[in-house]
């Protein structure tokens, strides 16, 4: 399990390939990459600034990863989240799950993203034509996370 919160850009393909390296027991790797969009809620977005709570954010991500590891037979799990200034088209987040079988990898990846969106302390501020604005959580994110508690 690896958790990284960083300002530096990353290569999603390289991250995905690294999950499989030196582990022949892996039969499936599922990855998710989230990108900065150039629009949100009908507004053009010129960029984004991501803030986090150092120490607390990593701890929250570690807890999410640990719970995923308890629920599914994962061989590897990686969570990488960027902070700082990001431009449209840049990757924000990578979640990679590796398992012997695909269903565990798919389910774990969905779970991690659903919980990351609702339980990890990140704050997004978008630059729009009307000026900067903080992005609020979506009800759909809460509903997605809720399904794992049933």
Curated annotation (Swiss-Prot):
Signal peptide: none annotated. Keywords: Molybdenum cofactor biosynthesis, Transferase. Substrate binds at residues 35-37, 101-102, 117, 124-126. Its EC number is 2.8.1.12. It is an enzyme of class 2 (transferase). Converts molybdopterin precursor Z into molybdopterin. This requires the incorporation of two sulfur atoms into precursor Z to generate a dithiolene group. The sulfur is provided by MoaD. This is Molybdopterin synthase catalytic subunit. It comes from Pseudomonas aeruginosa (strain ATCC 15692 / DSM 22644 / CIP 104116 / JCM 14847 / LMG 12228 / 1C / PRS 101 / PAO1).
